[in-house]
């Protein structure tokens, strides 16, 4: 079970959107994805809760958009040493977004592994109204990748919105 630093609002009418997506995205792709995410979120803003692990790449782009549009960020930390597994370049943004989170839930894993990442992804999907998948449609490069999260969400009947604009590329 996850431990919680704060509890989400019960009975809230806010739209809960989880995110899963690729990391290490080229700058041009980040711009395309950011534009698309902001356009989609504007339908709900500011009444939106973005649920994310704050991984580098798509997760942080999504969380920034939620914050900038006046929504709330809820963070799920997959493992005690999760931050250390992120790219060095992502630490600053991770720390800033983490500090602004409305709630933080920590899973009981020590090491940041594929299993802890998938457990976190399952948790965010289970509690979401919808999943935004920043995904090129290709198979996961390892267990717990975006394709696995999309398959899990679809199996549960959670609506999935794939975000991969024309011109987007993986790093």
Set out the residue ranges of the language-model regions.
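Acidic/glycine-enriched connector segments
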Residues: 8-170
